[in-house]
Every structure is written in structure tokens, then in C-alpha cells.
UniProtKB/Swiss-Prot annotation:
GO annotation, cellular component aspect: cytosol; peroxisomal matrix; peroxisomal membrane
Region (Amphipathic helix 2 (AH2)) residue spans: 58-75
Annotated crosslink Glycyl lysine isopeptide (Lys-Gly) (interchain with G-Cter in ubiquitin) location: K22
Protein's recorded name: Peroxisomal targeting signal receptor
Positions bearing the Glycyl cysteine thioester (Cys-Gly) (interchain with G-Cter in ubiquitin) cross-link: C10
């Protein structure tokens, strides 16, 4: 009973144990809030149990409360001892923490300006809330910004993005040792540690210099050998003769020529009224001069090359006629045969390059245009080969740039219209056309027209450039001019028909396309008797005619369109 005490000694103001408990538990709101439910349940249980106390128990409790003379237990010595123990524990730890924190900031500049992360002891935490309120709004704002301290500790970021010094075990062990030292010993140890680290860095630097010295000599030797090898290669390139440059160019040209479709041998028409005529070539020339159908002139030239397979001019004219007659494959096969017999034929080279562009074989076209420059302007080509004998590894853009520069140099030789080379302007226009630089293409083709205004081919090329440049009205004018100069120019009619379709003028498109197909007919030969090769060559015209009928909503006429069809059925509806 004496251990419990009695009377007023149980009050908090006079009970030393109660005062000690208040002192060490200044702010326990966080812990209490976590146990709030349990605390309330305990009170409820106490209130329920109070009504069940027996009369005997109540009498004993009254007797206990009436004891006034029993001395209370003296807690003053215990409180004094506890205070001494607490001060002895906190003071060295705080000194050690402050000393290590200051030393660490001096060693690491990344945390030199960081806020101190001090350990809060029970004594410090007693007045923390009061100190925080007195610190002012700046400190409170700073604390609010660090609600997620793991993202704002400089040491953590350095470990992730920097050298990771806080991740090493030696630093942690050193901190543990300094907690056991007094401030003077910590300072002495720090000075010794700093001197030792400086000496270690000096030794390490000296060893690294010794290790890197052989590498430096080896690198100098390797660099010298590389420079010497480069000199030898450059000297070998300079020693190449013009014949060797020519051989290299021929090799590259063959490479690009092999990259396009192999058109094979020329396929002749089975029915040809000129086959046994000894003057087939002259007949073909007269037909072209008189404005006859290109198909008839083509048959005459076919007969000429069949009679004399080495007739270069006949192969050239056959190729030109077939390309103008919208028979690209036959035209390319004839032109390639012409160049096989005469590799320097300028007309064949230019026409073949344009045909390659039409069929999408750009690199083959560039190589052919370079051959054209090499033939007509050998000085320009020779200087270009000396600086770069390759055709630049098949890169389409670089190859176009290289050949364009050659043609630009050739154009600079005769800037005046009176002395201008129309073929140079045509070649430049083709190069720009392949890169879809249609504004430059138009300028080049217009320049060629200034030199040769009566050449239907120039007007047709200008029309194609204008159409691709989204100028259909001007394109129609150019195509119309080409047809005025050569009414049997099938390609110009085909292009004109396409332009009318794009403009929504379907009836006019149909009439020009039907005219083009009719120009493929040969007098005395039924369309159904034409060879399969002839029918395939009409395919572009036929398919475009179907599109025009669909635009007119004449599906009844679409089924009547096929290669070798009779054209009489359309003459009552269309003027051609």
C-alpha cells in the first residue's frame, strides 16, 4: 500500500514521477492519434466496469484514500540520476555529430552549402515546435519545400548521378570512428587523412604518367604510319592515266546500266509491208518529213535494221520514233542497240537518258548524261574524272549533283542565246526534273525553246514540267503547241489527254486519247492482226481512256475498251 502513496501526493503537481513523465513526453500527439481508437475503447470499458464494484471493494478503497500519515515514495534522487545520465549521453553525441558534419562539409563541396542534417535528441525535440514557430515564415516555407526529403538530400543525388562517394564503405566506417573521438582528435585525424590522400594522389599520378608514356609513343608511330599510307594512296591516284580514268568510268557506267531493266533484243512486228523494200530507211525518213503516222515510219525503220543490223542511223531513228509514239520499251531497246554500235552518238545518249528517267531508272540516266558530257565536252569531263573518278557509290542524290555540276559548267561556256547549246539546257532540265525541281526544269526547257522554237519535243517537255508544277492550263498550251508542230506526236496527245482528265474535261481527253490510239493503226493492217507486242505498247493509252470514260460516268463504254479494239464504234460519239 505504501508504494502507491496517498492523499495529495498522488497529484501531478506534487508527484515527481508524474512530472518526469510530462517532461520526457512533451508532444506525443502523433503516437496518440495512432492509438486513438484503442484509447477511447479503454475509457468505455472503465466506465462500464465502475458500476460493477462490490460494497466490500468500495469500503477498502475508502480506507486507502483516508490514509494521511504514510510517507510517499521520494522520486527526487531517481530524477537527478536520470537527468545526469541523459546529459552524459547527449552531449558527446551532439559534439561528435557536429564535428563530423562540419568536417564532411569541408571535404565535399557538393554538400558544403547543404542544410545540416542533425540528429534530434529528446532534449532538442522538447522545444522544436516552439522554435519552429519563432523562426519566421522563411524557415516554415523551407520546411514545406522538403516534404519529400529523399528527393532533396544532396548526397543521394550525388550517389545516383555523380561519383557515388556516399555509397562507399570506407566513408561510413570513418564516420563511426569519429563518433568515438573528441573534437581535437577528430581534427588531428582529419589533417593526417588529408596529407595521406594528397601523397597517394601524387604517387598515382606518377604511375599513370609512366604507364601512358609507351602508349603515347605507340600512338605517334601509328599516326605516322597512317599519314604515310595516305600519302602513298594519294600518289597512286595521281599516277592514274587518262586511259585508266576512262576504264574506271566505263566500269561504273556498266554498273549503273545493269541496275535497270534488261530490255533485251528489239521485238519486230510480224506484218511489215516494208520488209523487202531495199529503200526502207529512206522511206521512213520521207514518212517522218511528210507528217505520216509514226507507226508507219517505225515499220520502215524496222525493215531497215533487219536488212542491215549495223545501220546506226536506222537504229537511232527507230528509237526516236518509238519513244515519240508512246512505245518506250521498244524505243529504249533500239537506242541501246544504236549505242552498242556507236557509243558516242549524242542524239541517242540524250534520248536514252530521257527514256530512263521516264521509266524510273535515274542512276542509269545520270551515267548516260555524263557519257554525253564526256563526248561533247571532253575537257569538262576530264577535269571531273581527275578529281573524282567514281560515280559516287550509287547514291542517287550525290550522282545527280555531280552530273548537274558538269552540265552547269558546260552551260557557262555559252551563256548567250545566240551561242547557247539547247541540248545542254535539255540535259539540265532532265536532271532537275528527276529531283522534282520543276521551277528550274521549266526555266531550262524554256531556254531550249528559245534556241529551237520549232522543235515539238521541246514543247512537250515543257508541258510535262508545267503539269507536274500544278499549272495544267499552261501545260495544255505547251502540248497544243507541240501538236501544232507535229500532229502525229502520240506522246504529246497522251500527255494532253491526261491533263484534260486532271482538269475534269473528260470529253476532250477521250478525243485526244482515241486519236492517239488511231495513230497506231497502220493502213492495210487490221488492228486484230497486230502482234501481242504492239497491243502491250498501247496499254497506257487504253487504260487512260478507261479512266476518262469513268469520269464521264459512261461505264457502258469502259467494257468496249481493250488493246486492238475497233475504233469505228466510237466515231459517232466523239470527234477524232
Amino acid at each position: 500500500m505504501s508504494l502507491i502513496g496517498g492523499g495529495s501526493d498522488c497529484a501531478a503537481g506534487s508527484n515527481p514521477l508524474a512530472q518526469f513523465t510530462k517532461h520526457t513526453q512533451h508532444d506525443t500527439s502523433l503516437q496518440q492519434s495512432m492509438r486513438n481508437g484503442e484509447f477511447q475503447q479503454g475509457n468505455q470499458r472503465m466506465m462500464r466496469n465502475e458500476s460493477t464494484m462490490s460494497p466490500m471493494e468500495r469500503q477498502q478503497m475508502d480506507q486507502f484514500m483516508q490514509q494521511q500519515n504514510n510517507p510517499a515514495f521520494n522520486f527526487q534522487p531517481m530524477q537527478h540520476e536520470l537527468n545526469v545520465m541523459q546529459q552524459n549521453m547527449n552531449a558527446p553525441q551532439q559534439v561528435a555529430n557536429n564535428s563530423w558534419n562540419q568536417e564532411f562539409r569541408m571535404k565535399d563541396p557538393m554538400v558544403a552549402n547543404a542544410p545540416s542534417a542533425q540528429v534530434q535528441t529528446p532534449v532538442q525535440s522538447t522545444n522544436w515546435a516552439q522554435d519552429f514557430q519563432q523562426a519566421g515564415p522563411e524557415v516554415q516555407h523551407h520546411a514545406q519545400q522538403h516534404q519529400h526529403p529523399i528527393l532533396s538530400v544532396p548526397g543521394v543525388r550525388a550517389g545516383i548521378y555523380g561519383g557515388g562517394r556516399l555509397m562507399g564503405g570506407s566513408m561510413m566506417n570513418r564516420a563511426a570512428q569519429m563518433q568515438q573521438q573528441n573534437p581535437a582528435q577528430a581534427q588531428t585525424s582529419e589533417q593526417s587523412q588529408t596529407q595521406w590522400e594528397d601523397q597517394f594522389k601524387d604517387i598515382e599520378s606518377m604511375l599513370n604518367s609512366k604507364t601512358q608514356e609507351p602508349k603515347t609513343k605507340q600512338q605517334e608511330q601509328n599516326t605516322f604510319e597512317q599519314v604515310w599510307d595516305d600519302i602513298q594512296v594519294s600518289y597512286a591516284d595521281v599516277e592514274l592515266t587518262n586511259d585508266q580514268f576512262q576504264a574506271q568510268w566505263e566500269k561504273d557506267f556498266a554498273q549503273y546500266a545493269e541496275g535497270r531493266l534488261n530490255y533485251g533484243e528489239y521485238k519486230y512486228e510480224e506484218k511489215n509491208q516494208f520488209r523487202n523494200d531495199p529503200d526502207a530507211y529512206e522511206i521512213g525518213m520521207r514518212l517522218m518529213e511528210s507528217g505520216a503516222k509514226l507507226s508507219e515510219a517505225g515499220l520502215a525503220f524496222e525493215a531497215a535494221v533487219q536488212q542491215d543490223p549495223k545501220h546506226v542511223d536506222a537504229w537511232l531513228k527507230l528509237g526516236e520514233v518509238q519513244t515519240q509514239n508512246e512505245k518506250e520499251s521498244d524505243g529504249i531497246a533500239a537506242l541501246e542497240k544504236c549505242l552498242e554500235l556507236d557509243p558516242t552518238n549524242l542524239a541517242a545518249l540524250m534520248t536514252l537518258a530521257i527514256s530512263y528517267i521516264n521509266d524510273g531508272y535515274d542512276n542509269a540516266a545520270y551515267a548516260t548524261l555524263e557519257r554525253w558530257i564526256e563526248t561533247k565536252y571532253p575537257d569538262i569531263a576530264s577535269r571531273a574524272r581527275s578529281s573524282n573518278p567514281d560515280l559516287d557509290g550509287g547514291d542517287r542524290i550525290e550522282q545527280n549533283k555531280r552530273v548537274t555540276e558538269l552540265f552547269m559548267k558546260a552551260a557557262q561556256l555559252s551563256p548567250d542565246v545566240a551561242s547557247m547549246d539547247a541540248d545542254v539546257q535539255t540535259g539540265l532540265g532532265v536532271l532537275f526534273y528527276s529531283m522534282e525541281e520543276f521551277d528550274k526544269t521549266i526555266d531550262c526547257f524554256k531556254a531550249a525553246i528559245e534556241v529551237e522554237p520549232d522543235k515539238a519535243l521541246n514543247w512537250n517537255r515543257l508541258g510535262a514540267a508545267l503539269a507536274n508544277y500544278n499549272k495544267p492550263e499552261e501545260a495544255v498550251e505547251a502540248y497544243s503547241r507541240a501538236l501544232q508542230l507535229n500532229p502525229n506526236f502520240v506522246r504529246a496527245r497522251y500527255n494532253l489527254g491526261v491533263s484534260f482528265i486532271n482538269m475534269g474535261r473528260y470529253k476532250e481527253a477521250v478525243e485526244h486519247l482515241l486519236t492517239g490510239i488511231s495513230l497506231h493503226e497502220v493502213e492495210g493492217v487490221d488492228a486484230s492482226e497486230m502482234s501481242s507486242n504492239q497491243g502491250l505498247q498501247n496499254n497506257a493509252l487504253v487504260e487512260t481512256l478507261k479512266r476518262a470514260f469513268l469520269g464521264m460516268n459512261r461505264r457502258d463504254l469502259v467494257d468496249k475498251v481493250y488493246p486492238g479494239m475497233g475504233l469505228a464504234q466510237f466515231r459517232k460519239m466523239f470527234d477524232f
